[in-house]
C-alpha cells in the first residue's frame, strides 16, 4: 500500500465544532423536526441557495431570501439570519486536532484543509483565519466548487503536490468521503475526534494523541 504523505482535514466538524450541531440547536429551539433543515438543503440540490452560498455565488445577505424559499418549499419556516447567528457562534477550534496537525507537519507530512464555507464579515475575501496551521487550504467559496465535487479533492492534492493515493482525508459527513475514496484517498469519518486520530495514527505510523 502506498505510504501516506499528506493528510487533509475538513474544518467544520473536524478541526472545529460542527455547524450541524448549531443547526440542530436552532431546530430544537424553534420546534422544528430534527434534521429537517439538512433535508431541505439536500432537496434543493446544487441549484439551491445553500450550495450557491458555498460556491461563493451568493453573499450571506443575498442568500437569506432564497434559502428561506427553499425551506418553505420543504414545508418549514426558517429565519435565515438567525440560523446563521447560531452557526457563527459555534465554530470553536478543537485543540486536540490542531495539536495533531502540528505533529504531522513536524514529522514531515504535508497537511491541508478542505472546507465548504462562505464569505463572512470576519473574512470576506481573504484566507480563512485558520489557514496558518496548514500547508494548503482550499475553500469552496473561493474556488467555485464544493464537496462532494471530485474536482475539489483533486485540487487540494495538487496544492499539496501529492497523488490522492498518498493522501488521507478526514470529514464528518459520509457523503463527502465517498468521492475521496473513489479517487484513491484513504478516508476517516470523524464522529469522535480522539478515535479519528487513533485511526489516523495507525495510517501514518505514529501517535497523534
Language-model features: locations:
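N-terminal helical cap/lid subdomain that shapes the substrate entry/recognition surface
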Residues: 2-99, 106-107
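Asp-based, Mg2+/Mn2+-dependent phosphohydrolase catalytic module
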Residues: 1-5, 9, 102, 114, ...
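Structured helix-beta-strand junction loops
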Residues: 107-108, 133
Amino acid at each position: 500500500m502506498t505510504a501516506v504523505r499528506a493528510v487533509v482535514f475538513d474544518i467544520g466538524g473536524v478541526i472545529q465544532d460542527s455547524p450541524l450541531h448549531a443547526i440542530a440547536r436552532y431546530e430544537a429551539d424553534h420546534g422544528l423536526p430534527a434534521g429537517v433543515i439538512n433535508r431541505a438543503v439536500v432537496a434543493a440540490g446544487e441549484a439551491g441557495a445553500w450550495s450557491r452560498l458555498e460556491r461563493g455565488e451568493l453573499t450571506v445577505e443575498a442568500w437569506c431570501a432564497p434559502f428561506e424559499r427553499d425551506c418553505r418549499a420543504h414545508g418549514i419556516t426558517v429565519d435565515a439570519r438567525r440560523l446563521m447567528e447560531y452557526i457563527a457562534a459555534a465554530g470553536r477550534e478543537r485543540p486536540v486536532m490542531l495539536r495533531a496537525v502540528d505533529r504531522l507537519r513536524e514529522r514531515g507530512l504535508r497537511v491541508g484543509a478542505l472546507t465548504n464555507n462562505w464569505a463572512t464579515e470576519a473574512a470576506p475575501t481573504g484566507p480563512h483565519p485558520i489557514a496558518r496551521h496548514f500547508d494548503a487550504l482550499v475553500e469552496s467559496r473561493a474556488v467555485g466548487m464544493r464537496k462532494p465535487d471530485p474536482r475539489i479533492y483533486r485540487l487540494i492534492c495538487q496544492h499539496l503536490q501529492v497523488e490522492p493515493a498518498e493522501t488521507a482525508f478526514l470529514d464528518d459527513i459520509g457523503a463527502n468521503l465517498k468521492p475521496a475514496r473513489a479517487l484513491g484517498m484513504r478516508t476517516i469519518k470523524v464522529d469522535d475526534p480522539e478515535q479519528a486520530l487513533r485511526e489516523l495514527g495507525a495510517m501514518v505510523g505514529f501517535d497523534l494523541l
